[in-house]
């Protein structure tokens, strides 16, 4: 993944509703979900959901496939994995990113 693709993907995920849509699709796995199912699950109006899905497709994070009269949206798991690899490529100077021995993890943070 190059920098411009990473920026596009991160930009698409930098909006709350789109992040929730993407997480729901990742949770659904390869079978994906229809817009109606996503709308009901996330309580997002159809027109708003359509806009967010278009942005996720444009960023390469989601694919859309017509199945008869329905559209199925699926997470582009390869793209997600490329993004994670891009973000961690230079993590910890090439060493495993694990805490030093003997340290205890602190409480789970909800923000960075």
What are the residue ranges of the model-derived segments?
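Alpha-helical residues within the helix-turn-helix
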Residues: 40, 57-58
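Divalent metal-coordination and catalytic microenvironments
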Residues: 49, 56, 73
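Amphipathic alpha-helical dimerization/coiled-coil segments
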Residues: 1-5, 23-27, 77-112
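N-terminal helix-turn-helix DNA-binding core of bacterial DNA-binding proteins
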Residues: 4-45, 67-79
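Base-recognition residues in the alpha-helical recognition helix of bacterial helix-turn-helix
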Residues: 23, 50-52
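Conserved catalytic-core motifs of GNAT/GCN5-like acyltransferases
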Residues: 65-67, 97
């Amino acid at each position: 993944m190059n920098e411009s693709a990473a920026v596009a993907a991160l930009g698409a995920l930098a909006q709350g509703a789109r992040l929730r849509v993407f997480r729901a699709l990742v949770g659904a796995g390869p079978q994906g979900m229809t817009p109606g199912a996503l709308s009901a699950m996330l309580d997002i109006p159809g027109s708003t959901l359509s806009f967010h899905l278009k942005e996720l497709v444009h960023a390469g994070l989601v694919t859309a496939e017509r199945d008869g009269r329905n559209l199925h949206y699926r997470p582009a798991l390869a793209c997600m994995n490329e993004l994670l690899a891009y973000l961690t490529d230079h993590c910890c100077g090439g060493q495993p990113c694990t805490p030093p021995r003997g340290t205890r993890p602190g409480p789970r943070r909800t923000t960075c």
